[in-house]
Amino acid sequence: NEVCPPGRCEPYCCDPRKCKCLSIDFYGLVCNCDS
């Protein structure tokens, strides 16, 4: 499985089954993924 790096949220890394796209001030959309 693709590892989700920190940074802008991308569909290929933000698998909705495992990851959430969060909108954070000053950073924009980021991937937040549970291990």
UniProtKB/Swiss-Prot annotation:
Contains 4 disulfide bonds. Expressed by the venom duct. The keyword Oxidoreductase does not apply. Keywords: Disulfide bond, Secreted, Toxin. GO terms for cellular component: extracellular region. Its main location: secreted. It is found in: Secreted. The keyword Disulfide bond applies. It comes from the Eukaryota. GO terms for molecular function: toxin activity. The cysteine framework is XV (C-C-CC-C-C-C-C). This is Augerpeptide hheTx5.
